[in-house]
A protein has these predicted regions:
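Conserved acidic segment of CheY-like receiver
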Residues: 1-8, 13-17
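Short hydrophobic/Thr-rich beta-strand motif most characteristic of the beta2 strand and flanking loop
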Residues: 21-29, 36
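Acidic catalytic/metal-coordinating carboxylates
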Residues: 29, 57-63
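Active-site beta3 strand of CheY-like receiver
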Residues: 42-53
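The feature encodes the CheY-like receiver
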Residues: 54, 84
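As written
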Residues: 58, 92-98
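C-terminal output helix
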Residues: 103-114
């Protein structure tokens, strides 16, 4: 699942995931992602989460996710343009698997990292 409010980036990430043989569900907002999780017959193997979303920040999304026993084990990869120590530590404390700074990694590298995690952890 990709939760990203920049539509062009959302499309690019989704296409790259599909090209890497990873099924992807695209969500433009945190609320859409949470609603989608309620309706999915099967939980996603991982979530790509942008920290800065229009409807809620990544921290609030993580709190909502971890409050549901059905969703609390879904691995979350936070992918953001900003990475203050407070943000990074807060997300990792809530169980994010990794906090990735967009500017420091190519899209292919981020997707390879997520794919490797999915393949080795499941």
């Amino acid at each position: 699942m990709v939760v990203e409010d920049e539509s062009l980036l959302l499309q690019a990430v989704t296409k790259k995931l599909i090209a890497s043989d990873i099924e992807a569900v695209s969500c433009l907002s945190a609320e859409q992602a949470l609603d989608y999780l309620k309706s999915l017959p099967e939980l996603p193997d991982a979530i790509w989460l942008d920290y800065h979303l229009k409807d809620m920040d990544g921290l609030m999304f993580m709190k909502n996710l971890k409050a549901n026993p059905l969703w609390e084990k879904i691995p979350v990869f936070v992918v953001s343009n900003s990475a203050s120590p407070d943000k990074v530590n807060g997300m990792l404390a809530l169980g994010a698997k990794k906090y990735i700074l967009k500017a420091e990694h190519r899209l292919d590298e981020i997707i390879a990292s997520i794919k490797e995690f999915i393949m080795t952890d499941n």
